[in-house]
């Protein structure tokens, strides 16, 4: 990006945003000022939903979502490990919740248009259940979400030199 900016588009500005990078080192490397923005905190209530070892992820997630919808207002965000699980849970939830609740997937393989739909309230005013990978944990704020269900599962890339 620095090469393009310096050689092709001097008018181009680079903005690097991260909650985890060392801001001072990055600002020094880019020879740029460091800007800071304070986040906001909200009260959080943590509850554990009992898992059933003999039950697959899809029915467990369905039970947790149905419980959340019946006991809490607002939309529900569910973190799942990957595209395959999102597709399976989406199908299971569509069968029991549609058309009263909008069930939306959110992962990197979706079109930009489909991803943007998640950022908008449902045009029919329905509650929403958003099924996302853990990438959404730190990259996007979804309006209307009042309950987050975390499966506790995530895919983490590993490098194997062999």
How does the language model describe each region?
Residues 1-162:
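P-loop NTPase motor module signature
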């Amino acid at each position: 990006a620095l090469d393009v900016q310096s050689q092709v588009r001097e008018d181009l500005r680079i903005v690097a945003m991260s909650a985890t990078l060392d801001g001072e080192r990055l600002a020094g490397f880019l020879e740029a000022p460091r800007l800071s923005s304070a986040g906001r905190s909200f009260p959080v209530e943590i509850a554990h939903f009992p898992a059933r070892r003999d039950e697959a992820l899809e029915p467990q997630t369905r039970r947790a979502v149905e419980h959340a919808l019946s006991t809490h207002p607002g939309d529900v965000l569910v973190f799942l490990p990957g595209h395959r699980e999102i597709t399976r849970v989406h199908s299971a939830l569509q069968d029991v919740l549609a058309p009263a609740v909008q069930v939306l997937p959110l992962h990197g393989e979706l079109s930009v248009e489909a991803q943007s739909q998640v950022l908008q309230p449902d045009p029919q005013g329905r509650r929403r259940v958003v099924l996302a990978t853990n990438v959404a944990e730190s990259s996007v704020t979804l309006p209307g979400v009042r309950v987050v269900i975390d499966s506790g599962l995530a895919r983490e890339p590993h490098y194997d030199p062999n």
